[in-house]
């Protein structure tokens, strides 16, 4: 634990990064030890009360084993899960948290250089340094716009297609179901790379095949080549449309299952009361969908907030740059990737941005879950 405080004192011999990682592990071990210590004290206190009250307690080893098997068997089953969660989630989070408060960058790479604790410097640099301030503001604003627009689009398309497919007059529902599931069936990275070629400015199918068809009805498109991959605005439009295509099948399947579970009596009563299609949707269909699927719908926004693959595979975060190593279409998670790769990595700055992302996503998700009563199923 002492090495966690100093992070070494001799370059070349002391690897500050390894010391930090070992210190994080020791910290977890100490916390677990303290928890077990107080749990033993509580158990001893409970046992003493039982003895004083004449309640039988386990005194022999055989009785203790029997008591653990009968009363503690569920805890024995979940211990492996807690151990896995500790090393797969909690441990990396603690290491990331610690790195955010160091000067770990390309100028301080262990073991040749030592790391130092720098406090809140990385967080203040995001606001004080003009390059990072401008990049962070631009990337954060686009990340929010992207998450809201793309998620809302895929949810709207998914609900709309599910409602259409669930209508009794629709024939060949299985065929429509297969068609709607095609974007989900094909691996996302293949679809993204295919769209990347289709949106090519000069030879892509969108500009050379699709737009000429619409030009017959929209004269201003005649002969126009939209710069899908060379203009940041049009690239963002293409990204949002692509995510709508990639994400709606999941919402479609989820919504279709909910629609088929809604009793027809509700719609019949609404019909008798003179409700039109919009009133039925607003007062029956949508509330039922929201009551059941609210956690999943919220998770679509949090997923797209950190949707790295589409940004990286489509155009590498380009075109152009907004400073601070961020591309014009980078979201926060892809900006973090840029900060940790290349010839001048900024690991501590990336860790600081990661913590900011976590705080934003967790806060918004918790507020949304609470406002929508996402886990209150009593009234459904």
Which role does the model predict for each range below?
Residues 50-69:
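Membrane-interfacial, low-structure loops and terminal tails that flank and connect transmembrane helices
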Residues 1-2, 10-30, 37-50, 73-380:
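A structural signal for multi-pass alpha-helical bundles of membrane permease subunits
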């Amino acid at each position: 634990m002492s090495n966690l405080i100093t992070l070494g004192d001799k370059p070349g011999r002391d690897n500050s990064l390894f010391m930090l990682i070992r210190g994080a592990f020791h910290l977890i071990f100490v916390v677990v030890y303290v928890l077990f210590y107080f749990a033993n004290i509580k158990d001893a206190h409970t046992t003493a009360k039982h003895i004083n009250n004449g309640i039988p307690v386990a005194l022999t080893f055989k009785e203790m084993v029997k008591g653990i098997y009968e009363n503690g068997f569920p805890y024995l089953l979940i211990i492996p899960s807690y151990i896995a969660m500790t090393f797969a989630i909690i441990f990396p989070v603690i290491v990331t948290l610690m790195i955010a408060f160091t000067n770990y960058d390309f100028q301080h790479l262990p073991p040749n250089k030592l790391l130092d604790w720098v406090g809140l410097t990385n967080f203040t640099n995001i606001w004080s340094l003009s390059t990072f301030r401008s990049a962070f503001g631009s990337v954060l604003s686009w990340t929010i716009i992207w998450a809201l627009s793309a998620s809302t689009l895929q949810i709207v398309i998914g609900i709309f297609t599910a409602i259409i497919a669930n209508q009794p007059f629709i024939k060949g529902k299985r065929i429509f179901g297969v068609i709607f599931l095609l974007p989900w069936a094909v691996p996302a990275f293949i679809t993204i790379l295919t769209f990347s070629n289709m949106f090519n400015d000069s030879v892509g199918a969108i500009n050379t095949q699709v737009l000429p068809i619409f030009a017959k009805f929209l004269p201003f498109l005649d002969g126009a080549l939209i710069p899908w991959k060379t203009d940041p605005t049009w690239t963002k439009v293409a990204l949002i449309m692509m995510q709508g295509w990639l994400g709606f099948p999941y919402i479609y399947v989820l919504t279709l299952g909910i629609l088929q579970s809604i009793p027809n009596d509700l719609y019949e009563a609404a019909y008798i009361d003179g409700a039109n299609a919009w009133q039925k949707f607003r007062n029956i269909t949508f509330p039922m969908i929201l009551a059941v699927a609210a956690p999943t719908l919220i998770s679509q926004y949090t997923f797209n907030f950190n949707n790295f693959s589409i940004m990286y595979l489509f155009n590498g975060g380009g075109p152009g740059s907004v400073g601070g190593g961020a591309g014009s279409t980078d979201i926060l998670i892809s900006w973090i990737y840029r900060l940790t790769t290349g010839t001048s990595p900024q690991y501590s700055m990336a860790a600081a941005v990661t913590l900011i992302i976590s705080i934003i996503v967790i806060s918004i998700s918790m507020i949304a879950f609470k406002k929508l009563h996402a886990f209150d199923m009593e009234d459904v």
